[in-house]
């Protein structure tokens, strides 16, 4: 099969056209340091098969049953991959097994209808779970949980003062 590599900045409209172009039959990513991976979530909305390592942030929205999970091994992140001042010597990320990924790509090409159904199911799950309203509620839940106990309303209990009737103020001298 033909494989096209894209590199550079694309507008939202261009990305949408690419995701939904009839010649694009599947979405492939060997990502390893993406975090949440918004492009893969967006690609899932096209209903086409997704081939990617289901590791790190992608686990939040790529279902093992509906995605072609690419085999990977976890490796230490090279220090050169971090912005200055952000290095973390304990950080690890997945590196795809290229040989097995190649075999899976060929299988998707040869058995496209089987994988196409999985892509459609992933689309349905993500369109249900990743609406703007559901993300808003999820964020509110996280913020509420983080802020619970940070500040609490407390009642103010002041002592009761007895009023003295015959209190005289001292006379002040003019300066």
What are the residue ranges of the model-derived segments?
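Short hydrophobic faces within alpha-helices
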Residues: 42-43, 51
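C-terminal amphipathic helix plus adjacent low-complexity
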Residues: 83-175
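Short glycine/serine-rich donor-binding loops of glycosyltransferases
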Residues: 37-40, 55
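Nucleotide-activated donor-binding/catalytic signature segment of Leloir-type glycosyltransferases, i.e.
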Residues: 1-18, 25
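A short alpha->beta transition loop at the rim of the catalytic pocket in nucleotide-sugar-dependent
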Residues: 23-25, 47, 54
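Aromatic "clamp/platform" in nucleotide-sugar-dependent glycosyltransferases that forms part
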Residues: 32
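Short hydrophobic beta-strand element within catalytic cores of glycosyltransferases
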Residues: 49-52, 68-71
């Amino acid at each position: 099969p033909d494989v096209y590599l894209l590199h550079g900045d694309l507008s939202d409209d261009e990305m949408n056209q690419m995701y939904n172009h009839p010649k694009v039959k599947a979405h492939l990513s060997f990502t390893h340091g993406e975090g949440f991976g918004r492009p893969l979530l967006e690609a899932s909305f096209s209903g086409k098969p997704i081939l990617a390592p289901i590791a790190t942030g992608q686990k939040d929205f790529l279902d093992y049953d509906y995605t072609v999970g690419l085999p990977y091994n976890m490796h230490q992140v090279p220090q050169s991959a971090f912005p200055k001042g952000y290095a973390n010597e304990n950080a690890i990320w997945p590196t795809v097994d290229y040989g097995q990924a190649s075999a899976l790509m060929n299988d998707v090409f040869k058995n496209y209808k089987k994988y196409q159904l999985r892509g459609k199911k992933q689309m349905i799950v993500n369109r249900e779970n990743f609406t703007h309203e559901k993300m808003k509620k999820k964020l509110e839940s996280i913020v509420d949980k983080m802020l619970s106990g940070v500040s609490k309303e407390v009642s103010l209990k002041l002592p009761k003062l007895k009023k003295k009737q015959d209190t005289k103020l001292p006379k002040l001298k003019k300066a």
